[in-house]
Each structure stands twice: as C-alpha cells, then as structure tokens.
C-alpha cells in the first residue's frame, strides 16, 4: 500500500470517529468486530501454479499465511459511519489488503472511500515451440521435402516470473444542496498504479524469422477526476457526468539493436547485405512502448416517468482520447504529436406495459467513432524521403437496436422474447461491414415452493464478421516438372518477383476467429426444501462457427456445475461447488515460412 493511500485512510478514519467531536462525545450506537487467523499451506502442483492462481489469494509455495478483518460501525442522530479493513499477509510479492469507509452526515453529504492492493501473475511464453532450420552453420535443408519449423526463437529471461502489483484508491462524495431541492452534486477522485514486470516479445533483425522475448518494466499510473450532478423534479430525472483521465507510463521501454546483416550461411559465400538493407541504425531501438494518454468524456441522461408506468430515457455521450506520439530521429517522423479518437454516442429506451401480463422494452444506440489521419515520413539513406499517408482503421459507425417482451404466464412463471440487430459500418473497405441478428428466448418459473427452473436460449446470425482480409494462401506452381524437387512461386505477368510482390500481394484467403453462427443454451434449477438448505444444478452449452473463404472456425463449450449451501443451527454456513469446463477450438492459422 502506498503512502498516499495510507495518509488518506488515516485522515478519513480520524474524520469519521473524531469529527465532529461533540457528536461522538455523547452516547452513540457503536459496534464492531475483529477476526484474525493464520494458516499453514502446502502447495503441490504438476505444472505452473500460476495457471490456477492468476489472481493469487494464497501463497505460491509452502509457508504460513495470516489474515485479519476489522469492522466498525457508529451512528448518532443523523451521522453514521462504517469502516471495513481486510488484510492478508504472506503472499508472494506483497500483502493483499482492502479498506472501505462510508460516512453519512445528515444525508446532506455522503462520502465513500475504498482502496485495494492485489497481485496479478502474467503469462510467460517460453517460445520453445519455435525452432530454425538454418540458425547455425551446416548444410542446407530442402524446405519442400523436410518440413521442419523455420523460425528461430530466444527467451532471454527463461526463469523469470512476471507479476503486476495493482493498487487502486477511489474517493467519492455526494452533496445534496438544501437551496436546490432534488439536486445532488457528485465529485470523485481515483488513482490506479500498476508496477512490476511483463513479457515483451519482438521480431529481431530484418523479418519475422527470429522471435525474442525479454522482461519489460511496468510502472503505470492512472488518475481520474470526476464531477457531475443529478436532478430529480417529479417524474423528470436529469443526470450529467464529467471524466478527466490521465495515464502515464513512467518506466522505460525495452530496446534492441539490429544485427549486422550478413549473407546466408554455408554453402553460400559469406558477405554483407548492405545493399538490401531497408535502413541501418547503429543505436538501440525501443519497442513495445506504451504511450501516455489523456481522456475526457461528457455524458448526459434524461429520464421521464409517465403516469401509466411507462418510462422514456434518452442519453448522449461525447468522449475524446489523445495518445502521445513521437517519431524516432534519423528513422521516421510524424506530422502530429498526438493522435485523437472521438466518440459520439446517442441512446434511447422506451418501456411500457401492455395489459396486465406483458412489458415491452424498446431501445436503440448509435455510435460514431473517428480516429485521426496522419503522415509518416521515413528518413532516406539516399535519395528522397519515403512518405506514407495513413487513415485510422478504427473509424466506424455502429447501430444497435433491441426489442424485449416479458410475458407473465402464471404466478411465478414468465417467458421473455428478445430480438437484437447490430450493424457496424467501417470506413476501410478491406475490413468489411458487419451485420448481426440475435434472437433470444428465456423461461423462468417456480414449479413448486421448493423448486425453480431457469432456461435461456440465444441464436446469433452474423454476416461478414471482422476478419483479416487476404491474409493467407499464396497460389503455388511447380515449374520444375515431375523431375523437380521444389515447389516455387511464379511471377504474374509484369510483376517483379520480389518477396512482397510475389507472396504478400498474392494472398487470397481471409482469416478470422469471429463466428458467423452462434447457438448458446443455459439451464439451471434450484431446490430449496428449507431455509437452511439449497442446491443448484446448472449447465451452459455454446457452439459457434464460421465458413469464410477457404477457412473454417469452430468452437464448442460445455460447462456444467453444481453448488450446495447449508446452514447449521450453530450459525455455521457451509458452501460447496463444482464446476467443469470443456472447450474445443478448431481454426486454421497462417504460419510464416522464412528460410535463411
């Protein structure tokens, strides 16, 4: 826990229980509880313990672990306060802890403050599934007949454990103004800090034939300042909220140095490749950089409650995010110092009763997202600079329409019918436009006093999901005849047989792991014969697939489970649960084939 959080919570606690002193000096309702304990843990695992302990609440190795809980409540007249403290020591890198404070001053001022410290284990890709055919000296390999992996890899930190320690503190206050009945002001301040290490992976030298992983320092800080108001005037409610967010990465980005370019290994003659270099840079280059950013947003919401029980809601959100950008001297430059993204979102909802047994809800949302265009200029080694213009691929318009009908069949039994239409219109033609229709059906019923059942089914029909256009499958032609041993690509008429022209520009197939069709069903039943016992059985089944050009993707999920709760007469509660998850995915992928 950082010093700032400690000081804030100490001051808040002093304000709660010492100010105003005249209030707490008199008799007041005061209660509290304290709990502490220790546990000895023996950890046994056959694989990486982080796979089942990503957000650790227990130690990663054998040892003693302690915990403590404190809860205090006090009230007098119109003043009330409560304080919760939770502490767990003995974890791997830091102590897990959380604090929460609530203070109510005559319902005119309400203060809420909380802080939390937690750990997050990061993934470590060993890269040992990547190997090369020509990483060292020796004879060449026939790539047409000996299908070995053709990518080299180096994990520079094979023994390192990557972990992020996250600290968050939130402070919020609601202030009711006696001079303006029905109006409440809201102010808030939030900080989040992430500190530790993550794995950074990059491509080395000239292409993607050499993959390298190393450690990257993380020292991020996010600050949020919020303000707003809520006004209630009879059946009319008006809300406005403002957010100002600053993000800063205080750690330096990892760097790498471009290797000297040499000719292929034996039996070819050794020599330099200076004539084929796109650029030559003698110093270290930064990669995997996280830019600083700023965000501001304004949101307004109006709600009208009608006399017949109907409800009408309208909303508008404007957000602007700026990301700091800079070129790299002697390599490239940008025509702007920051890139800006804008969001305009409009929403509406209408809810009304149809007779005594049906409720109809209609809603819609339109989002307009726009990103900056920019120009990138590469500094020339000789001759003129190379200038490239870019337009933002995130620019798009989104439409979302929903209809929901709730039907009451009998006492304790309802059926819900729903339909949703989604449309995404992207500015880049290569990314395509997506349309989706979603159909929903749900049943919720109490079959008896002790037995209840919930069933839900959803079907999604998606046209042109987001995909990587022309991402794979270069047409190959055997030009050596039956006696040949190699399959090579032939140049089209008028096309130079360079790598980019011959391979990348001639790919034909699209790749995506986004589905075109989804079926999902959920069912659960709860049996509660008494107020001291309850058990629930549940299951989820999901099947999704697509069939784009020369590519197919399928994924199936089966996730059943059961839970049981039992309360003894002595105040002891027992909870047991079992969950099973089986997920199978089949998807074609395009693997780069680089050889020497």
Language model features by range: what are they?
Residues 1-2, 17:
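Intrinsically disordered, low-complexity regions enriched in Ser/Pro/Gly/Gln/His and often acidic
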Residues 2-10:
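Bacterial N-terminal signal peptides that target proteins for export
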Residues 10-20:
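Bacterial N-terminal signal peptides
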Residues 26-30, 38-596:
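Gram-negative and organellar
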């Amino acid at each position: 826990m950082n010093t700032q959080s400690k000081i804030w919570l100490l001051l808040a606690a002093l304000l709660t229980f010492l100010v105003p002193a005249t209030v707490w000096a008199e008799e007041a309702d005061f209660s509290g509880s304290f709990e502490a304990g220790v546990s000895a843990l023996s950890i046994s695992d056959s694989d990486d313990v982080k796979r089942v302990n990503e957000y650790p609440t227990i130690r990663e190795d054998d040892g003693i672990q302690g915990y403590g809980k404190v809860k205090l409540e006090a009230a007098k007249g119109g003043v009330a306060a409560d304080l919760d403290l939770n502490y767990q020591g003995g974890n791997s890198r830091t102590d897990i802890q959380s604090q929460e404070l609530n203070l109510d001053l005559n319902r005119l001022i309400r203060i809420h403050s909380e802080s939390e410290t937690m750990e997050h284990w990061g993934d470590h890709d060993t890269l040992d599934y990547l190997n090369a055919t020509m990483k060292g000296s020796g004879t060449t390999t026939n790539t047409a007949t000996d299908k070995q992996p053709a990518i080299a890899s180096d994990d520079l930190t094979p023994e390192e454990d990557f972990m992020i320690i996250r600290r968050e503190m939130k402070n919020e206050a609601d202030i009711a103004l006696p001079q303006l009945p029905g109006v409440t002001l809201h102010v808030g301040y939030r900080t989040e800090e992430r500190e530790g290490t993550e794995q950074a992976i990059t491509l080395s030298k000239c292409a993607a034939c050499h993959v390298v992983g190393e450690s990257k320092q993380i020292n991020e800080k996010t600050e949020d300042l919020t303000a707003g108001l809520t006004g209630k005037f009879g059946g009319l409610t008006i809300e406005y909220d403002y957010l100002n967010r600053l993000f800063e990465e205080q750690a330096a980005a990892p760097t790498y140095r471009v290797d000297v370019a040499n000719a292929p290994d034996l039996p070819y003659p050794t020599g330099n490749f200076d004539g084929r270099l796109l650029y030559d840079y003698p110093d270290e280059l930064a990669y995997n950089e996280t830019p600083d950013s700023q965000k501001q947003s304004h949101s307004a919401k109006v709600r009208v409650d009608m006399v017949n029980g109907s409800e009408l809601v309208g909303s508008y959100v404007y957000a602007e995010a700026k990301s700091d950008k800079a070129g790299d001297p002697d390599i490239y430059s940008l025509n702007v110092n920051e890139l800006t993204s804008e969001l305009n979102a409009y929403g509406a909802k209408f809810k009304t009763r149809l007779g005594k047994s049906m409720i109809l809800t209609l809603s819609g949302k339109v989002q307009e997202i726009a990103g900056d265009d920019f120009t990138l200029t590469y500094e020339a080694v000789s001759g003129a600079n190379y200038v490239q213009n870019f337009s933002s691929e995130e620019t798009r318009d989104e439409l979302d329409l929903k209809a929901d009908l709730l039907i009451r069949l009998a006492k304790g039994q309802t059926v819900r019918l729903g339909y949703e239409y989604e449309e995404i219109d992207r500015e880049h033609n290569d990314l395509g436009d997506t349309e989706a229709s979603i159909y929903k059906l749900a049943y919720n019923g109490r079959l008896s006093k002790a037995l209840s059942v919930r069933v839900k089914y959803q079907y999604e029909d998606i046209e042109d999901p987001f995909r990587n256009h022309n991402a794979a499958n270069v047409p190959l032609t055997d030009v050596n005849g039956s006696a040949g041993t190699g399959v090579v690509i032939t140049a089209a008429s008028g096309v130079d047989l360079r790598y980019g022209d011959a391979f990348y520009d001639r790919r034909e197939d699209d790749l995506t792991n986004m589905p075109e069709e989804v079926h999902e069903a959920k069912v659960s039943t709860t049996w509660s014969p008494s107020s001291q016992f309850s058990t629930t059985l549940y299951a989820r089944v999901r099947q999704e697939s697509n069939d784009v050009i020369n590519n197919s993707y399928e994924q199936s999920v089966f996730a059943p489970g059961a839970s049981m709760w039992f309360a003894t007469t002595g105040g002891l509660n027992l909870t047991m649960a079992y969950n099973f998850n089986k997920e199978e995915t089949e998807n074609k992928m395009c693997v780069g084939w680089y050889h020497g």
